[in-house]
A protein has these predicted regions:
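A short, N-terminal "cap"/entry segment at the start of jelly-roll beta-barrel domains
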Residues: 1-35, 127-163
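A contiguous, mid-protein "functional segment" used to position or interact
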Residues: 99-146
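Conserved short histidine dyad/triad with adjacent acidic residue
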Residues: 22-25, 39-53
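Ligand-binding loop in jelly-roll beta-barrel domains
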Residues: 32, 68, 88-112
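Hydrophobic small-molecule pocket/channel-lining residues, especially in calycin-type beta-barrels
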Residues: 67, 82, 116
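Short acidic-glycine-tyrosine-enriched beta hairpin
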Residues: 9, 73-91
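A cytosolic small-molecule/anion-sensing beta-strand core signal
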Residues: 63-64, 79-80, 98
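Glycine- and acidic-residue-biased ligand/ion/polar-headgroup-sensing regions
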Residues: 55-67, 72
C-alpha cells in the first residue's frame, strides 16, 4: 500500500473490458493506502445483477445518461449530475436506461481488484464488442472471494448461463 501523492491526466488509468462495459481504474487501493477505489464506467443500456457488497460502501456520480437505481426497497431515477450512495450490506441494482458515463467510488478500496480479475485489459478505449458472455461460475467464485453476494443475475445473463 502507498499513501503518496499521485495524479492522472484525463487519459490515465487502467482500462478494462468487463462484459459490455469499459471501465478505467483511476485510483486503486495500492495508490490510496486502501482508502478507496475510483473507476470511470462507460456502459451500454443494460443492468447490473441484484447484489450486496459486504466489504465496501459504493457511490456513483452520473456524468451522462439515465440510470434507475434500486437500493433496498427504494428505486430512484438519476440523470446527469446525480449522486447515488449504496451502503454496504444493502441489496442493490443499477439499470442503465441509456448508454451511460459514471464514476464509481468504493470505500474502502478492493472492488477494483474484483473488476480487474473479471475483466480483461481493453485494447482500445471504447465499449467492448457486443456479445461478451458471462462466465457465471468464475463470476460467483470471484464475487464470494471479494465479499459480494449475488442475489439475482440480470435476465440476459441467466439465459446465457442456461446455454
Amino acid at each position: 500500500m502507498s499513501n503518496e501523492f499521485f495524479a492522472l491526466d484525463s487519459e490515465g488509468g487502467d482500462p478494462i473490458w468487463y462484459l459490455q462495459v469499459l471501465m478505467t481504474i483511476k485510483a486503486s487501493g495500492d495508490k490510496t493506502g486502501g482508502a478507496l477505489g475510483l473507476l470511470d464506467f462507460r456502459t451500454p443500456a443494460g443492468q447490473t445483477p441484484l447484489h450486496i457488497h459486504h466489504k465496501e460502501d459504493e457511490g456513483w456520480y452520473l456524468l451522462d445518461g439515465r440510470v434507475s437505481c434500486t437500493c433496498g426497497d427504494e428505486t430512484v431515477s438519476a440523470t446527469p449530475g446525480a449522486f447515488l450512495w449504496l451502503p454496504r450490506d444493502v441489496p442493490h441494482r443499477l439499470r442503465f436506461e441509456t448508454e451511460c458515463h459514471l464514476l464509481q467510488i468504493a470505500i474502502p478500496a478492493g472492488l477494483e481488484v474484483f473488476h480487474k480479475k473479471m475483466g480483461q485489459p481493453a485494447p482500445r478505449i471504447e465499449l467492448p464488442p457486443p456479445g461478451q458472455a458471462l462466465d457465471t461460475e468464475k463470476y460467483k467464485r470471484l464475487a464470494a472471494e471479494h465479499g459480494l453476494e449475488i442475489i439475482q443475475l440480470p435476465q440476459w445473463d441467466e439465459q446465457e448461463a442456461r446455454k
